[in-house]
Amino acid sequence: NVEFAIKLQGNVLVPLDSHFPVERFKAIDDAHQRDDKKAMIDARTKLAKAFKDKAKSVNEKYIVPPKTTDFGIVYAPTESLYKELTDYQDPSSKELLTQELMKKHKVVICGPNTLSAYLQSLHMGFQSLKVQKGAT
């Protein structure tokens, strides 16, 4: 089961799962401490792969419209992890990880400071739709 499901108007659920591959994240810090650029690139690539796998899993298991939204959220529980993810750019395609996950798997990455803002914007969007439907 998904870790959290946020209920929106109309009983539509937003699937929200958290992910924190500690060893992958720790490897980045270790490489940074050693000033080992090659190890740092390798560690960041492995962290990105872990989140790609998680996004794929969330998409396959929990995104099931019309019961859910057509997207899911993966929560990165620390700001430093969130920053690593939002900064990561695929070396060959030059695409940002966050863009790739949204395009391929319809998954948004949120961190501690962005989750509440993202959920608030969803709420406001649904409120706006409700007002528009009431006006017609």
Pin down the residues of each PLM region.
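Amphipathic, heptad-repeat alpha-helical coiled-coil/stalk segments that mediate oligomerization
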Residues: N1-T136
